[in-house]
């Protein structure tokens, strides 16, 4: 177990304190950042949320949202997944552990109200956040932005086929083409990463999250995470739940505009105990 590290707290606005952090319980040092409302303390605990970026991205993609949520009284934590940004290691089959490590770090902060914590993720980060929520069974709020659907193809999910050379090569090439096309900098253990996806079932996790308010956000022009591919998982999700489908592309939920404003407003209401539906 690594000893968590933090930098000195700095006040970046009249409303928010920020600090760089490092944490990790699984032999991988993860780099992140916390955004804390200035009025938060152990005597005035506030809601909190972990924000999880997508494949090939890093924590910077969520910093605007993290600051805006902190300005609304919610402590936030962003971080780089293993194999991404400044964090150590390679992207493999343990990304859910990264989310849970981030959750534990945030949970341990004296300013945080443990009963009002949430997970927010985009793309791969949304997929991982759902799986982590299923393991933790403690999240009050779950926000999944542009989440890929699970793999239900009987050939792909059969353990005998996962490492079939042709299947493994095909899936690997798809990720590599995306990585090169968009100039993504990711350190990947392909064997472990490719084996991870078919075995993970967000629908099972979502079915058991009865006490968690869930929001799913999709864009009609998103070929990476088409909303119709997530319908099975959404159908399996327990209430309370809501879906937003807007025009846009894979990254539109992260960009300044109406959609980002809407899901952030929903999150603020849910974590502050105001009915968001």
Across the structure, where does each feature detected by a protein language model lie?
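N-terminal cap/lid segment of alpha/beta-hydrolase-fold proteins
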Residues: 2-44
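Short beta-strand element of the alpha/beta-hydrolase
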Residues: 44-54
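The serine-hydrolase catalytic nucleophile loop
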Residues: 54-67, 81, 228
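Conserved alpha/beta-hydrolase
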Residues: 66-86
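Catalytic nucleophile-loop/oxyanion-hole region of alpha/beta-hydrolase
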Residues: 82-114
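Alpha/beta-hydrolase fold nucleophile elbow
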Residues: 111-123
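Hydrolase active-site cap/lid region
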Residues: 134-191, 213
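Serine-hydrolase catalytic core
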Residues: 183-272
């Amino acid at each position: 177990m690594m000893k968590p590290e933090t930098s000195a707290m700095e006040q970046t606005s009249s409303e928010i304190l920020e600090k760089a952090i490092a944490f990790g319980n699984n032999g991988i040092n993860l780099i992140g950042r916390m955004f804390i409302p200035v009025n938060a303390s152990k005597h005035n605990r506030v809601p909190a949320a972990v924000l999880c970026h997508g494949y090939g991205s890093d924590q910077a993609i969520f910093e605007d949202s993290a600051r805006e949520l902190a300005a609304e009284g919610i402590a936030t934590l962003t971080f780089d997944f293993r194999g991404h940004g400044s964090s150590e290691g390679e992207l493999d089959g343990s990304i859910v552990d990264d989310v849970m490590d981030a959750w534990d770090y945030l949970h341990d902060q004296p300013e945080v109200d443990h009963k009002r914590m949430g997970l927010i993720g985009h793309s791969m980060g949304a997929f991982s956040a759902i799986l982590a929520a299923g393991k933790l069974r403690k999240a009050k709020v779950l926000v999944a932005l542009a989440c890929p659907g699970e793999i239900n193809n009987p050939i792909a999910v059969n353990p005998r086929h996962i490492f079939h050379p042709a299947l493994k090569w095909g899936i690997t090439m798809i990720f590599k083409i995306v990585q090169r096309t968009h100039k993504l900098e990711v350190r990947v253990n392909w064997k472990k990463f490719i084996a991870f996806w078919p075995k993970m079932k967000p629908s099972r996790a979502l079915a058991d999250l009865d006490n968690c308010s869930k929001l799913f956000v999709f864009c009609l022009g998103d070929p990476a995470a088409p909303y119709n591919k997530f319908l099975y998982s959404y159908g399996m999700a327990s209430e309370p739940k809501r879906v937003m489908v807007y025009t846009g592309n894979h990254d539109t939920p992260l960009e300044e505009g109406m959609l980002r404003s809407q899901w952030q407003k929903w999150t603020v209401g849910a974590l502050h105990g105001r009915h968001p539906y």
